[in-house]
Amino acid sequence: MRWDRFVLSCPTATFFHRAGWQQIMAKVFRHDTHFLYSETDGQIDGVLPLAHVKSMLFGNALVSLPFAVYGGVAATDEAAAMALEAEAQRIAQRLGVDHLELRHVAARHDDWPKQDLYVTFRKAILPEEEANMLAIPRKQRAMVRKGIKNGLRSDIDPGVD
C-alpha cells in the first residue's frame, strides 16, 4: 500500500501513522476517520491520520491519533506539511469540534497550544545487556532488576501473528 510505503520511508513518521490504524479507529472505537495525504507528481509526500472523537469522556475533538502517543503530520516536504495542517483545520471547523489535537513527536509550532501530559524516553539498545542496564537511571534500574528477579522476561517475536 502506498500510504504504508511512505510511512516506512518518512523520518518523521511513527508506528501510529500506519494505515491499519484507520480500521482500528473506525471498527473498534467507532470514530469517523480522515486519513489525509499530500502528493507531488504522483508520489505521497505527507500524511496526517485523524479521527473524530465524540464522547462524554473525551469531548468533541479531531485527534491525530486517539489512544496513541504519536500522530500529527509526517511529511518529507514543508509545503506538504503545511497543506495537511490547513486541511485538518478546515475539517475541524466544518465538524465544529472543540479542538484539533496533533500529537507530533517534536512540536512544529511554538505558538500553538500544547499539553505536557506525556514524556517519551528513547535510548539505543546496545549489544551488551549490562550496558543497557547501566543506561537506565539508578532507581528505575533497581525496579527493572527486581522485575527480572521475580520472573519478568522479554522475548523477541519475529511476527505479530
Language model segments and positions:
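N-acyltransferase acceptor-side catalytic subdomain
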Residues: 1-161
